[in-house]
């Protein structure tokens, strides 16, 4: 299991390095230029971008010799799937750290650029939940479909994740009165819903992969 996870991390590393360089430059710009829109963009791009990096390389699961060789190793198919899900979580946390450092430096030099400090929580919740929903949708599609269509699957996953987040936010805004308590409840609801979807997706993907023949 550790070997599978290590391989997934290394497989993502080349894309993540390029994206990290972009995020560092973007972060410097965000610290120098005190603009709320820039900060929002950095949060969303940073957290979601690293998750996309893990999904892009998943195509190698079936198109390389390593992908087929893994099936001969003394590991279960559930372990193979679990390593993919854990890999996304790890890189999601990396993206969250990048964003946290940049926002911290921006607040240090310019103060909070949002109308309320609690708005930062909302941005984090939106980005994290979109990343989790994206993975929850992508992996079952990927393992049920064909590796050659992985690009189509992750585009579908991103669009669906955005739609789900917008739907949840719209419903909560209609049910809750404006206020800090409502903002916190909304952020927590997004995280809980996305985590639940991620967990259910894992079980579904294991079921799909265990029945698939190669």
What are these regions (language model features)?
Residues 79-81:
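Alpha-helix N-cap/helix-start motif at helix boundaries, enriched for small hydrophobics
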């Amino acid at each position: 299991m550790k070997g599978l996870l290590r391989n997934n991390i290394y497989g993502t590393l080349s894309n993540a390095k390029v994206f990290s360089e972009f995020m560092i430059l973007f972060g410097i710009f965000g610290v120098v230029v005190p603009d709320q829109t820039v900060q929002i963009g950095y949060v969303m791009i940073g957290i979601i971008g690293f998750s996309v990096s893990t999904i892009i390389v998943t195509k190698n699961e079936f198109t390389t010799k390593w992908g087929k060789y893994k099936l001969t190793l003394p590991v279960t198919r559930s372990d193979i799937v679990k390593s993919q899900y854990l890999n996304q979580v790890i890189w999601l946390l990396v993206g969250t750290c990048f964003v946290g450092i940049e926002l911290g430096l921006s607040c240090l030099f310019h103060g909070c650029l949002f109308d309320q400090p609690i708005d930062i929580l909302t941005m984090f919740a939106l980005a994290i939940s979109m990343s989790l929903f994206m993975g929850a949708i992508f992996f079952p599609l990927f393992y049920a479909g064909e590796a050659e269509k992985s690009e189509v699957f992750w585009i579908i996953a991103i669009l669906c994740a955005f739609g789900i987040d917008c739907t949840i936010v719209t419903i909560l805004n209609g049910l809750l009165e404006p206020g800090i308590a409502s903002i916190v409840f909304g952020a927590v609801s997004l995280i809980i819903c996305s985590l639940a979807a991620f967990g259910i997706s894992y079980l579904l993907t294991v079921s799909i992969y265990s029945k698939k023949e190669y």
